[in-house]
Curated annotation (Swiss-Prot):
Effect in UniProt of substituting residue 47 to V: In Mutant KD-21 and Mutant KD-52
Coiled coil: 142-170, 466-491
Subunit-structure text: Homotrimer of disulfide-linked F1-F2. Interacts with HN and M proteins.
Gene: F
Protein name stated in the entry: Fusion glycoprotein F0
Record-linked InterPro entries: Fusion_F0_Paramyxovir
Organism of derivation: Sendai virus (strain Z)
Length: 565
């Protein structure tokens, strides 16, 4: 059965390695480097979705029950130092407790002593709106309420025992570690010294040790005692202070050794002071240990860009700061809330983000879809470290090689130049001198005819990419529109032409002018005729439409006729 389990683990590990290799190979890092895009090998992804709770009860004053009050004065002085350290912390906890309304309290026996401890289930915040800090603090208090009885019992037992370490597991499986500081020193050195060296000498040794312990206490828990918020625990200081292996707290964590390493490396073990007991000089800390779950087959790559040259112009490719690659997915990664260890990214949720299709194809090696912007200033990076060497744009920069500062001439058919320790030991870029790694190899992937996408603005990237696609579409449709316009102009009739319209307008204007001239001539002719016959006399032989009878009346025609009769 054991062999079968080991074989299954080996097979799963091999599949994971193969899958990780395939995911890493889908990004052509060599081709992208030719246009100044630098992509690292990537790190795995782990999700910290939940945590385990631990509690540490610190007894800061050792149990001293010497005869004749030996060492009492030194202990009193030591307590005064602790008061100056712990009283402000206790007052802050009291203020925090006052902001939380108790909605569900437990009943206790009337005769039982009321021990001072935070015990409340979160209800409403006194001022109405709960901030995230208040909610976090309230959750810590509510969780501490569940362990109240167990912690109270171990605090009571610590006052009655002379052991330096007590370990208790409560009903829900949460460990409570009790550290009684300096108790071993008192038991092993101070008590024997009283009988050998006398009370005064032993008391002096105790005072020196207490002062030293106070300094070590500030070193180990200074960040935790200085605030009521969450702070990372200093594991090394805690281990050396109490002569114990602090990793014992994590013995029941259901996780692997690599996860424990990542948690320690990123300082994700947080401690919060939840109780200060000035009567017993005990401090209780709530410790949160995150539980990590690795997402198989996922790598997060860190990406960056430097400028490169093509056709005598300097360009810059815009890429996401982090790229998440999965078997069938390639996108961006928002690591704002993530922490980075040496091998992994630890995130509270899946950081995957969608990126435009053109940017995906660019990262996969199709440089014709890469969104670029033209460099107009010197703020764009000109060099970067890759594969133990340096990749630089030596056309837009002044590059030198070796201790003799030999100038580097970059081929204009190449976008960038790759420099390593083999071909250039001391590398200089714009006056900055760099030593390449001796283990770096010469990154020569050959000269490629590079073609990139349309120029865009860097901010915002998504909008610019959409505008770039729209620009390509408009450029393609412009030629088709020109062809359609020519066809329409050829198919149209004669009166649709521009020359015909102009001719018609000119003819109409000429006709209008002629009509006006004719009217003026007729008007002047009639006026001249009226001026030539002022008496309005008309000759007899002149043809007129007026009746002849009128002339008969006017010329005496009727009178002559009457005489004849």
């Amino acid at each position: 059965m054991t062999a079968y389990i080991q074989r299954s683990q080996c097979i799963s590990t091999s599949l994971l390695v193969v899958l990780t290799t395939l995911v890493s190979c889908q990004i052509p890092r060599d081709r992208l480097s030719n246009i100044g895009v630098i992509v690292d090998e990537g790190k795995s992804l782990k999700i910290a979705g939940s945590h385990e709770s631990r509690y540490i009860v610190l007894s800061l004053v050792p149990g001293v029950d010497f005869e004749n009050g030996c060492g009492t004065a030194q202990v009193i002085q030591y307590k005064s130092l602790l008061n100056r350290l712990l009283i402000p912390l206790r007052d802050a906890l009291d203020l925090q407790e006052a902001l939380i309304t108790v909605t569900n309290d437990t009943t206790q026996n009337a005769g039982a002593p009321q021990s001072r401890f935070f015990g409340a289930v979160i209800g409403t915040i006194a001022l109405g709106v709960a901030t995230s800090a208040q909610i976090t603090a309230g959750i810590a208090l509510a969780e501490a309420r569940e362990a109240k009885r167990d912690i109270a019992l171990i605090k009571e037992s610590m006052t009655k025992t002379h052991k330096s370490i007590e370990l208790l597991q409560n009903a829900v499986g949460e460990q409570i570690l009790a550290l009684k500081t300096l108790q071993d020193f008192v038991n092993d050195e101070i008590k024997p010294a009283i009988s050998e060296l006398g009370c005064e000498t032993a008391a002096l040794r105790l005072g020196i040790k207490l002062t030293q312990h106070y300094s070590e206490l500030l070193t180990a828990f200074g960040s935790n005692f200085g605030t009521i918020g969450e702070k990372s625990l200093t594991l090394q200081a805690l281990s050396s202070l109490y002569s114990a292996n602090i990793t014992e707290i994590m013995t029941t964590i259901k996780t692997g050794q690599s996860n424990i390493y990542d948690v320690i490396y990123t300082e994700q073990i947080k401690g919060t002071v939840i109780d200060v007991d000035l009567e017993r000089y005990m401090v209780t800390l709530s410790v949160k240990i995150p539980i990590l779950s690795e997402v198989p087959g996922v790598l997060i790559h860190k990406a960056s860009s430097i400028s490169y040259n093509i056709d005598g112009e300097e360009w810059y490719v815009t890429v996401p700061s982090h790229i998440l690659s999965r078997a069938s997915f390639l996108g961006g990664a928002d690591i704002t809330d993530c922490v980075e260890s040496r091998l992994t990214y630890i995130c509270p949720r899946d950081p995957a983000q969608l990126i435009p299709d053109s940017q995906q194809k660019c990262i996969l090696g199709d440089t014709t879809r890469c969104p670029v912007t033209k460099v107009v200033d010197s703020l764009i990076p000109k060099f970067a470290f890759v594969n133990g060497g340096v990749v630089a744009n030596c056309i837009a920069s002044t590059c030198t090689c070796g201790t003799g500062r030999r100038p580097i001439s970059q081929d204009r058919s190449k976008g960038v130049v790759f420099l390593t320790h083999d071909n250039c030991g001391l590398i200089g870029v714009n006056g900055v001198e760099l030593y390449a790694n001796r283990r770096g190899h010469d990154a020569t992937w050959g000269v490629q005819n590079l073609t990139v996408g349309p120029a865009i603005a860097i901010r915002p990237i998504d909008i610019s990419l959409n505008l770039a696609d729209a620009t390509n579409f408009l450029q393609d449709s412009k030629a088709e529109l020109e062809k359609a316009r020519k066809i329409l102009s050829e198919v149209g009739r004669w009166y649709n032409s521009r020359e015909t319209v102009i001719t018609i307008i000119v003819v109409m204007v000429v006709i209008l002018v002629v009509i006006i001239v004719i009217i003026i001539v007729l008007y002047r002719l009639r006026r001249s005729m009226l001026m030539g016959n002022p008496d309005d006399r008309i000759p007899r032989d002149t043809y007129t439409l007026e009746p002849k009878i009128r002339h008969m009346y006017t010329n005496g025609g009727f009178d002559a006729m009457a005489e004849k009769r």
